[in-house]
């Protein structure tokens, strides 16, 4: 059993993708990285912004079992603050700086039958706009189920492997090239941003 954050990873697919992402962004001090595949996350920051399309494949309260499940989880009426406190995108938006140093991998198929590509893209945009470095893949021609999940899962595990043993992609050659490019940027009045593996460089 690994003790401490380093070497502690969490991953999952679909509902498990949402759960793993939620756990990682709620408790980034616990995990070194998360690999979330096709996470069942609604593209919204508030419960009232969820659309009919976003409810496909999820409990929507239409049937008795759904109503019981929603009441058990979120209360009756829905506790919207509690919902936001457990929604990955809303958690990220509230305080993105907590995620600096957390390895984050998101992926989804662009043919997802539950439209989960919409929610995954939404989470990606929240992270991107906050300047939090992460890896995101929209897999061309892939659905929520099927043969694509095998290579996609291997890609997710490869990401985890890179967190265990980070490749030296920014080597001396790259640093020299960056230094030359930075001088050119300065001369032309462009902003210069230093290399930071935790932030998107343009932020």
Q: Predicted regions span which residues?
A:
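Non-catalytic cap/lid and distal C-terminal segments of serine-dependent acyl enzymes
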Residues: 1-203
């Amino acid at each position: 059993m690994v003790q401490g954050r380093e070497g502690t990873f969490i991953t999952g697919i679909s509902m498990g993708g949402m759960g793993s992402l939620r756990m990682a962004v709620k408790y980034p001090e616990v995990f070194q990285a998360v690999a979330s595949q096709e996470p069942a996350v609604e593209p919204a920051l508030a419960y009232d912004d969820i659309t009919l399309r976003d409810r496909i494949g999820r409990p929507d309260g239409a049937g008795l079992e759904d109503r019981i499940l929603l009441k058990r989880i979120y209360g009756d009426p829905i506790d919207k603050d509690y919902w936001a406190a457990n929604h990955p995108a809303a958690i990220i938006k509230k305080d993105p700086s907590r995620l600096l140093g957390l390895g984050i991998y998101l992926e989804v198929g662009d043919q997802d039958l539950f439209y989960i590509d919409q929610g995954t893209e939404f989470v990606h945009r929240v992270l991107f706009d906050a300047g939090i470095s992460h890896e995101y893949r929209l897999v061309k021609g892939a659905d929520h189920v099927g043969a694509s999940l095998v290579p996609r899962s291997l890609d997710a595990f490869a990401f985890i492997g890179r967190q265990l043993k980070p490749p030296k992609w920014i080597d001396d050659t790259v640093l020299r090239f960056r230094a030359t490019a930075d001088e050119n940027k300065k001369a032309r009045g462009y902003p210069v941003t230093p290399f930071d593996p935790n932030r998107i460089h343009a932020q």
